[in-house]
Amino acid sequence: MAPKLCVICNAERAVLRRPKTAQQICKECFFYVFETEVHHTIVSNNLFKRGDRVAIGASGGKDSTVLAHCMKVLNERYDYGLDLFLLSIDEGITGYRDDSLETVKRNQQQYQLPLKVLGYGELYGWTMDDIVKSVGRKNNCTFCGVFRRQALDRGAAALGVDHIVTGHNADDVAETVLMNVLRGDIARLERCTDIVTKGPDGSEDDQHQEGCGSSGSNGIGVGGSGIRRSKPFMYAYEKEIVMYAYFKKLDYFSTECIYSPNAYRGYARTFLKDLEAIRPSSIVDIIQSGQNLKVSQVVKQSRKTQLQNCLRCGYISSNTVCKACILLEGLEKGTPQLGIGSEKSRKIKDIRSENSKEVEKVSITADGKERKERRIPQWTGVAKDAPPISSLPFVPPQHKVDLSF
């Protein structure tokens, strides 16, 4: 049986099937269509302008390595006129980040791009190894996500760049859409599918995004005044990125973070992979669903906050103290749970705490003596300003229960 020919060039032998389109094509045609699609994403969304200084978030993994390679190739092929830099964050994870940084340093030599490395230790005085020893593995991703985004902004400010590009791919975006739906965070659905984000509310991840602390012309910092973030791989499938790295023989680090196996995102990822196996277009379908969902004006208004500089570090924030400083305060005080969770959940914890304070009850006994009792009132889960039960509408049960024997 004769080998199948590439459906694009109809000359070379087909060596792979594209996960995105199921086309059987040769290596060279795969490289061409992959790079052309990324170029189309960049051009159609006006991601850059000539003369931009662009920092590539480099972790040494497949996504950032392929992104660095493609950005260099496309910048030269289509004459974007960009000044490219590699920006890497050292979270301080022994046996993981130290090894991946060696890959980043090799990439720097291979692509001849300037490299800037910033570490959690120098920025915050805590490495992720230190944080995990203090908080355990349950909520460590919260700390890492907040610290990493701020570190990227600070690194970008140090490099004087206009734009940060990250290797978030179509799978990542679809996972984030699913996570926001599962958590009922409808307000974030509208912006998690944006290819360009800027300022405190421009998070592509599942954590709160805040800006950068260096002063800008508007007085609220670089994160709110100029540094953009974009995802050139927003429509690129993860499987195709892996195939590109494999056939191009790119040098990348493939070990998963040792602290992330129990991350909430992992469950969304597993579900997405199951959907993709049944229907490959599910990834793009989910992204388009997130883009097409209409968020009510009430929800939009509830998410609007006035930006200001953190009183402690100067980082732009929607609160007087930024999330990173709150988390650091918890670590320093030995109360690492401080700042973890949503604002709503923290308010509930505050109500629990207030209602669980010890109170003193004074009564007079039959013989005229004063008796003091100390007790902790039981928390009922009802806020102080909750309406009385009698004012609430009666909702009949949906199902009748037969208690007869």
Swiss-Prot record:
Gene Ontology molecular function: any one: nucleotidyltransferase activity
Cited Gene3D superfamilies: HUPs (3.40.50.620)
PROSITE patterns: UPF0021 (PS01263)
Protein name (record): Cytoplasmic tRNA 2-thiolation protein 1
GO biological process: protein urmylation; tRNA thio-modification; tRNA wobble position uridine thiolation; tRNA wobble uridine modification
Taxonomic classification: Eukaryota, Fungi, Dikarya, Basidiomycota, Ustilaginomycotina
Broad class of enzyme this protein falls into: transferase
Coiled coil: none
